Amino acid sequence: MVHWTAEEKAAITSVWQKVNVEHDGHDALGRLLIVYPWTQRYFSNFGNLSNSAAVAGNAKVQAHGKKVLSAVGNAISHIDSVKSSLQQLSKIHATELFVDPENFKRFGGVLVIVLGAKLGTAFTPKVQAAWEKFIAVLVDGLSQGYN
C-alpha cells in the first residue's frame, strides 16, 4: 500500500478539479498517438490517424481519451486503494486488448505534460512530484494483470 501525505493528496485532487476529461483526455491520447505512433496499432478501428490533424479531428480519439481520463478520475477517487480499483481494467488490457504495459508509462508521461501545459506555473515541482508518484501507482495498478 502506498503512503500518501495530505499535501500529495491535495495536489492531486486540486489539479484533477481543473481537468476537463473530454478536452484533456483527447489532448493526452492524441499526443500519445502522435509522439509514439506505434501505439496506433491498438486503435486500428479509429480510422485515419496518419498525421497530427487527423488525430486532432478524430472523434474516436476524443471519446476514448475521455474514457481513459474518466478511469484516471476513478483511480483518484480511490487513491488509498488504486491498485485494487484497477484490477478489472488491468485484466482487460492484459488478456483481451494485449496492450504492452510500457504504454501505460508513456501515457502517464504524456498526461503529466498535458497537465503542466494546462496549469503553467501552478504546476509546481511539488505538484508534479505528487502527480509523478500517482502515475507510478496508476501504472503499477494497470500492470498487475500481466504475468
From Swiss-Prot:
Binding sites annotated in the UniProt record for heme b: 64, 93
Pfam families: Globin
GO cellular component, one term: hemoglobin complex
Domain of life per record: Eukaryota
Keyword RNA-binding: no
An example molecular function term from Gene Ontology annotations: oxygen carrier activity
Protein name in UniProt: Hemoglobin subunit beta-2
